[in-house]
Design a protein with these regions (language model features):
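Surface-exposed, low-hydrophobicity beta-strand/loop segments enriched in small/polar/acidic residues
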Residues: 1-146
Length: 146
C-alpha cells in the first residue's frame, strides 16, 4: 500500500495536538496548517503562518466552512513527528521546507527569518538508505520542527 498525505511516516516519537478551526475554514488531511492571530487553525500558505506559532500537518480533514471559530477541532502532527505530505515543487534531500499557496511543502530558499520553515525533507517512502530528491506532486516524508 502506497503512502498517502497525512499519514504518519514513523510509529515512534509521534506528537498530535488538536486545534480549534477558524470560522468558514476547511482543513484538508495532509496539508500544512498554521494558526491565525486568534490561535485558530487555518491552511498554511507562503504568507500565513509563523515560526513562533508553528506550522503543522493535518492528519484528518475537518469542514468548518459553515461554522464559527472554534466550532470544530482538527488533529495535527506537531513537534518532531515524521509525516507524509505533498511536494509542491522540486525539493532536495535535507532541505528545509515551507508552505506554498496550496499548503504543500516546497523548498525554503531564503534565510530563516524571511520564511516560515516547518520541517526538513527526509525522503520518499522506504528510502531510509538512499533517499532521492522530490518532484512536484510526490508524496514525501517531512520531519516537522527545526
Amino acid at each position: 500500500m502506497a503512502a498517502a498525505i497525512g499519514q504518519l511516516a514513523r510509529s515512534t516519537g509521534i506528537e498530535i495536538q488538536s486545534f480549534n478551526v477558524a470560522a468558514s475554514t476547511t482543513i484538508t488531511k495532509g496539508k500544512l496548517v498554521a494558526l491565525n492571530a486568534s490561535g485558530h487553525a487555518v491552511a498554511a500558505t507562503s504568507s500565513v503562518g509563523t515560526v513562533a506559532r508553528g506550522v503543522f500537518v493535518a492528519i484528518e480533514t475537518v469542514d468548518n466552512s459553515s461554522g464559527s471559530a472554534g466550532d470544530k477541532e482538527v488533529r495535527c502532527a506537531i513537534g518532531n513527528t515524521y509525516v507524509y505530505v505533498e511536494a509542491g515543487g522540486a525539493v532536495k534531500v535535507g532541505e528545509t521546507v515551507k508552505a506554498d499557496n496550496n499548503s504543500d511543502a516546497v523548498a525554503a530558499t531564503t534565510i530563516f527569518a524571511a520564511e516560515t520553515h516547518c520541517g526538513r525533507y527526509i525522503g520518499h517512502e522506504n528510502e531510509e538508505a538512499d533517499p532521492t530528491d522530490a518532484a512536484d506532486g510526490d508524496v514525501i516524508i517531512v520531519r516537522l520542527g527545526l
